[in-house]
Amino acid sequence: MNSKFIVIEGLEGAGKTTARDTVVAVLRAQGINDIVFTREPGGTPLAEKLRDLIKQGIDGEVLTDKAEVLMLYAARVQLVENVIKPALARGSWVVGDRHDLSSQAYQGGGRGIDSQLMASLRDTVLGEFRPDLTLYLDLPPAVGLARARARGELDRIEQESLAFFERTRARYLELAASDASIKTIDASQPIEQVSASISQALAQWLTNQELV
């Protein structure tokens, strides 16, 4: 089977790290051991610097919504061109913690940036490049935020209002409903059931890939 790009998406506290472990276990059970892990924003020296700016901001300066989204796409194109595409070209599988869907949901939905601008940014920066599979971990924002707060200090985005995350979730669900490559997982279940749901969805997808 050719190398694939699998992305894990979701709000804060959705359990992306646990989901990644489940994805890796399923892939390795299928004999897929050459796996590259990525996270967004980040993954290259420049992208990591941009991540710090996006997450923490700069004292005394307001980070505008458009500046935020432009930095996210700058970080993304660095990661895609320098890490993800080369990994796929040499036959590695790539498992990503977030990708473009995050920007479409957080900045397009949460921030309310015009959908045409968001689509234009995606198409200009990424062209036709898309993940082969996205696992979207869905849960009520209040639940996810409670989990995030329990982990400790919140970053700039995690400190946004509940209404912001409600809008973000709504956009996630809207986009997932219109794209067959996005599989929605109920992340409000107990962790064992979430892992089982991910395993089932991924195993079925892998079977379908072998049949193509």
UniProtKB/Swiss-Prot annotation:
Molecular function in Gene Ontology: ATP binding; dTMP kinase activity
InterPro entries: P-loop_NTPase, Thymidylate_kin-like_dom, Thymidylate_kin_CS, Thymidylate_kinase
Chain positions recorded as ATP binding sites: 10-17
Keyword Nucleotide-binding: yes
Top EC category: transferase
Cellular component GO terms held in the UniProt record: cytosol
Keywords: ATP-binding, Kinase, Nucleotide biosynthesis, Nucleotide-binding, Transferase
EC id: 2.7.4.9
Gene Ontology biological-process entries: dTDP biosynthetic process; dTTP biosynthetic process; dUDP biosynthetic process
Reactions catalysed, as given in the entry: dTMP + ATP = dTDP + ADP
Claim: Transferase is one of the keywords in the record: yes
Membership in a protein family: Belongs to the thymidylate kinase family.
PANTHER family per the UniProt record, alphabetical: THYMIDYLATE KINASE, UMP-CMP KINASE 2, MITOCHONDRIAL
Biological role stated in the UniProt entry: Phosphorylation of dTMP to form dTDP in both de novo and salvage pathways of dTTP synthesis.
The protein, known as: Thymidylate kinase
Encoding gene, per UniProt annotation: tmk
